[in-house]
């Protein structure tokens, strides 16, 4: 926030410069005097209501989650993946990882997910979207998804049609997972997931390119 250049770079990689400018305009740095640097286990006390900040890299190196002990809720940002309520079926949820550019790290992400679960949250509050109960089935879905897309990237990232191949494989995987929870409205689901698949694919390819260039 003090120097938003990396944030701008990442957002432009996702949306493209033209769409970025339409959506966000100019990103103005925040004066350092207005910023609290929250290290791992930092406590923010709102007159007795304490929120604990937890370092959770994997989606991005700077990412943190926030633990609210009073409600046993973990605010997970993008670390705990993406889950849409309009894809739910009879209280069954489907969840999948966010691998958007530019700092995806699967090993760190899985470690962060287990770190979240050490708090035994009754609910995880996702940026995309809403609060869900982190059952073992949900956790397994998320971890399996990370392994699947990581292997996709390793297998296809250097192919000429890498983006299209990874998108197709990822979409098929997600639709099969959604079918397993009893949702058979696959055309609606395909449209719902299209943008996520495109953005996640960009992040996976960038991750593999970064590994190759290091």
Language-model-derived ranges and their functions:
Residues 1-57, 61-125, 129-133:
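Metallo-beta-lactamase
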Residues 5-9, 70-71, 89-91, 139-141:
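Short, glycine/charged-enriched secondary-structure capping and boundary segments
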Residues 18-29, 93-98, 185-188:
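Short glycine/proline- and acidic residue-enriched helix-loop micro-motifs
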Residues 36, 57-60, 195-198:
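A short catalytic or substrate-binding loop motif that flags glycine-/basic-rich loops and adjacent residues
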Residues 100-119, 124, 132-167, 171, ...:
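Internal alpha/beta domain cores that form substrate/cofactor-binding pockets in large enzymes
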């Amino acid at each position: 926030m003090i120097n938003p250049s990396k944030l701008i770079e990442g957002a432009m990689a996702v949306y493209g410069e033209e769409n970025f400018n339409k959506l966000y305009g100019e990103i103005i740095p925040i004066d350092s005097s207005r910023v609290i640097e929250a290290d791992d286990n930092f406590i923010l006390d709102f007159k007795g209501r304490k929120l604990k900040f937890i370092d959770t890299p994997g989606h991005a190196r700077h990412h943190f989650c926030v633990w609210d002990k009073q409600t046993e809720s973990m605010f997970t940002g993008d670390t705990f993946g993406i889950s849409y309520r309009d894809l739910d079926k009879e209280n069954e949820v489907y969840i999948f990882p966010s691998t958007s550019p530019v700092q995806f790290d699967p090993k760190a992400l899985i470690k962060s997910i287990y770190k979240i679960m050490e708090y035994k949250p009754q609910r995880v509050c996702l940026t995309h979207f809403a609060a869900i109960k982190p059952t073992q089935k949900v956790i397994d879905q998320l971890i399996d998804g990370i392994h699947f897309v990581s292997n996709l990237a390793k297998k296809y990232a250097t192919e000429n049609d890498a983006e299209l191949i990874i998108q197709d494989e990822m979409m098929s995987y997600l639709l099969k997972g959604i079918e397993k929870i009893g949702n058979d409205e696959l055309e609606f689901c395909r449209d719902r997931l299209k943008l996520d698949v495109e953005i996640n694919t960009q992040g996976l390819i960038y991750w593999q390119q970064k590994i190759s260039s290091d």
